[in-house]
Amino acid sequence: MSDTPVVVIPRKGYVDGHHGYHHSYHSGLNLLLRLLQAFATAAAVIVMLLATQTEFTRYGEVRGRWRDYPAYKWFIIANAVVFVYALLATLVACCALIARRGPLSYSPSAWLTFLLDFVAASALMSAASAALAVALIARNGQNLQGQHYWPTFCNYVTRFCDYAQGAIIASFCGFGLLALSTLLAASALHHLAWHRLH
């Protein structure tokens, strides 16, 4: 019999002695999601910062500025923080794809990624929902049984409202992408547990 060693190269992933696991599908999809998250949150921040308009009407000056609304301030802060997180996660995902080792390759780091993505997604949902409530009242007004009335605002500063609406849509897209990243981390944890048991 020949003593020539036989080398078996795994095609989809590998497991090492430290309960680490690498899957090219996870790494590639993680990098793509991080890039899209960074793009969506950056677009949300930039567009909201541009949401400023002043118009002169027969009733006087009508001004729409994001800084006049606490909900829009929180919106910008939340999206900016998530953008920084997504940018750092993109760098980590890029290094993981090259080195075939990353945060989704080990249980502790995969759990940390899962929790951070969950917190970031919750922050985006909170900020986008609050901003959406303000935007809807500004566009449609509100009448509560004739006692309290908020008149429509967007018929005077259309560009301001359109910009705010576009920023909110971008933020909700970022939330959806973060939700997918959370599911991806959960999938990686499932694969790690399966390979640890087998």
UniProtKB/Swiss-Prot annotation:
GO cellular component term, pick one: plasma membrane
Membrane topology: Multi-pass membrane protein
Protein name as it appears in the record: CASP-like protein 1U1
Family according to the record: Belongs to the Casparian strip membrane proteins (CASP) family.
Keywords for this protein: Cell membrane, Membrane, Transmembrane, Transmembrane helix
Disulfide bridges in this chain: none
InterPro entries cross-referenced by the UniProt entry: CASP/CASPL (IPR006459), CASP_dom (IPR006702)
Location, primary (coarse class): membrane
Extracellular compartment residues: 52-73, 139-165
Self-association state and partner proteins as the record states: Homodimer and heterodimers.
Superkingdom assignment: Eukaryota
Annotated localization: Cell membrane
Topological region Cytoplasmic: 1-30, 95-117, 187-198
Segments passing through the bilayer: 31-51, 74-94, 118-138, 166-186
PANTHER family listed in its UniProt record: CASP-LIKE PROTEIN 1U1, CASP-LIKE PROTEIN 4A4
